[in-house]
């Protein structure tokens, strides 16, 4: 008699979350909500015309072979702030690569602020991430992505591994911004180079696309002066890049910059928990 061997294939986390909003009576209201697998979306109460969405990976982190898909649709005249419940942790991958794909669409006069908390990459983590954004001609968009190469306070560092990050931002179908980052192999040696991170282990990119780019530049430059980084503005677009010695030092610079790019509004409350 032949007995089938039990599968030893490890379980993989899968999640898919979709949120769509519409404007109604001057407020941003929920139009569609879908969540599947490890993806959850929570909507804390707000007291203005915006909506706050907190996306959650109930798996508690990602490793090789896991995949999360997020979709955000902001209808005309809406405002959505999207953040994460906690820092996303990317653990050592025994095989394959974790994937995170985020799609954002903003209609006429809408604004979307994509404000996830930091992503922490542990040693031998493997992550491929993609952000695709489609903006109406009159929409505004703010994106913040911060990366920690390990947890310095815990004596942890990402020495080997893979991190790929791809952004494609389009306005009315035209490509207006592209990012392509790849850290592969000996990450510690690569990031030690002066032309890369000069040994810093925490870094971030902020992008604002909209009519206030020039105004924001004047507010942001004094905040980043004296730190490792800089800010540039052109064609209704502002890009800020920062690096710091650890996550705490990065946050001290990052949070005031985010607030400036949000007309003085604070970061989402979950950032303070």
Swiss-Prot record:
Q: Tell me what this protein is called.
A: Urease accessory protein UreD
Q: Which GO terms describe its cellular component?
A: cytoplasm
Q: Where in the cell is it found?
A: Cytoplasm
> In UniProt terms, what function does this protein have?
Required for maturation of urease via the functional incorporation of the urease nickel metallocenter.
Q: Where is the major localization of this protein?
A: cytoplasm
Its taxonomic placement starts with: Bacteria, Pseudomonadati, Pseudomonadota, Alphaproteobacteria, Hyphomicrobiales
The UniProt similarity line reads: Belongs to the UreD family.
Q: Which GO MF term does the entry hold, naming one?
A: nickel cation binding
The record's section on InterPro entries has: UreD
**UniProt keyword annotations, A-Z:** Chaperone, Cytoplasm, Nickel insertion
Give the quaternary structure: UreD, UreF and UreG form a complex that acts as a GTP-hydrolysis-dependent molecular chaperone, activating the urease apoprotein by helping to assemble the nickel containing metallocenter of UreC. The UreE protein probably delivers the nickel.
């Amino acid at each position: 008699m032949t007995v089938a061997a039990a599968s030893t294939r490890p379980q993989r986390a899968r999640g898919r979350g979709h949120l769509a909003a519409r404007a109604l009576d001057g407020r941003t209201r929920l139009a569609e909500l879908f969540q599947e697998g490890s993806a959850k979306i929570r909507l804390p109460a707000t007291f203005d015309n915006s909506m706050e969405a907190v996306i959650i990976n109930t798996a508690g982190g990602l490793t090789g072979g896991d995949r999360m898909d997020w979709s955000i649709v902001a209808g005309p005249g809406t405002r959505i702030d999207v953040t994460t419940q906690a820092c996303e942790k990317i653990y050592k991958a025994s095989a394959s690569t974790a994937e995170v794909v985020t799609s954002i669409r903003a209609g006429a006069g809408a604004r979307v602020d994509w404000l996830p908390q930091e992503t922490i990459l542990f040693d031998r983590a493997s992550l491929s991430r993609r952000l695709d954004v489609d903006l109406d001609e009159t929409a505004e968009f703010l994106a913040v992505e911060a990366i920690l190469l390990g947890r310095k306070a815990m004596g942890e560092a990402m020495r080997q591994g893979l991190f790929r990050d791809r952004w494609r931002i389009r306005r009315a179908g035209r490509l207006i911004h592209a990012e392509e980052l790849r850290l592969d192999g000996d990450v510690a040696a690569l990031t030690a180079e002066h032309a890369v991170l000069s040994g810093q282990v925490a870094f971030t990119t902020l992008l604002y696309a909209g009519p206030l780019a020039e105004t924001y530049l004047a507010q942001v430059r004094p905040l980043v002066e004296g730190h490792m980084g800089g800010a540039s503005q052109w064609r209704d677009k502002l890009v800020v890049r920062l690096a710091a010695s650890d996550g705490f030092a990065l946050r001290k610079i990052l949070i005031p910059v985010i607030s400036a790019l949000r007309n003085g509004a604070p970061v989402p409350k979950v950032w303070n928990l």
